[in-house]
Swiss-Prot record:
Claim: tRNA-binding is one of the keywords in the record: no
Record Pfam families: YjcZ_2 (PF09680)
Induction: Expression is regulated by the mother cell-specific transcription factors sigma K and GerE.
Keyword terms: Membrane, Sporulation, Transmembrane, Transmembrane helix
Cysteines engaged in disulfide bonds, as pairs: none
BP GO terms, sorted: sporulation resulting in formation of a cellular spore
Localization (cell): Membrane
Protein name: Probable small spore coat assembly protein B
Family affiliation: Belongs to the SscA family.
GO CC, alphabetical: membrane
Bilayer-crossing regions: 4-24
Membrane topology of this protein: Single-pass membrane protein
C-alpha cells in the first residue's frame, strides 16, 4: 500500500513540475 502511495505521490510531483514549466513558458 505504501509503494502505491509513493508512486502516486511521485507522479503528482512530476505533473506539478510540468504544470509549473508549462505555465512559466506560457507567461514568458
Amino acid at each position: 500500500m505504501g509503494e502505491v502511495f509513493a508512486g502516486g505521490f511521485a507522479l503528482l510531483v512530476v505533473l506539478f513540475i510540468l504544470l509549473i514549466i508549462i505555465g512559466a513558458s506560457w507567461l514568458y
